[in-house]
Amino acid sequence: MKNIAVTVDNLCIKYRGLKKTSIRASWSRLRDKVEVFEALKNVSFELEEGKILGIIGKNGSGKSTMLKAIAGVFSPDSGTIDLHNNSISLLSIGVGFNRKLTGKENIYLSGMLLGFDEEQIKEKEKEIIDFADIGDFINRPVKTYSSGMYSKLAFAITAILETDIMLIDEVLSVGDAKFKEKSYNKMKELITDDKRTVIIVSHNLTTIKNLCDEVLWLNDGEVIEIGKPEVIIPKYEKFMNE
């Protein structure tokens, strides 16, 4: 019997912001009202150890919010997330790097945040740098990087410093064609480990179909359906084309 790697139970996350008021209301000194947006609404699922879950949905459906909640970046307003004592890493553009530090310094910072000690990171440093393949930029501040270079380094760190659970947000589609192929092949290599659990967010349905064991379809923060890619993806495509 497989162990459970991730349990999400009735997860709700809300964003709060100031609602815009009219000029007349401003002149009347009426208070701005707080507008609440429900990003995730009572989301529940379990993912077995070693399984690959793809999350699909239109823009704004809550996919990235889901990953950040599982990673601990966002706290639930209600509901629970249980990682069952597994280590976890989030690979997402704009998350995790100190932009003032060099790429090499960020390798160590990211590694330590993932729970690795300096010696363990040192052993993997050359492999990470070679995989990222960003040349002399590895010694320059991350703030000088293009989005493609950022993605290459982020993917290299997450893929080489292997955690129990990997969360991947759209980065398989970033970078030049050569790196896309390299990262895709690395993902296929990683998921052959029946102990590693992966959750992928992507608009590339071919990637989801080829890599994932199951697909979770989100729409406006709610789970529409969870099932096999060959069942869920045709339904989603029909929905998007209506």
What are these regions, as identified by a protein language model?
Residues 220-221, 236:
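Conserved ABC ATPase "signature" C-loop
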Residues 208-210:
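A short, surface-exposed alpha-helical micro-motif characterized by mixed small hydrophobic
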Residues 56-58:
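The feature captures the beta-strand-to-loop junction immediately N-terminal to the Walker
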Residues 27, 108, 120-137:
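Conserved ABC ATPase "signature" region
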Residues 2-38, 230-242:
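Pre-NBD coupling/linker segments of ABC/ABC-like ATPases
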Residues 202-203:
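H-loop/switch region of ABC-family ATPase nucleotide-binding domains
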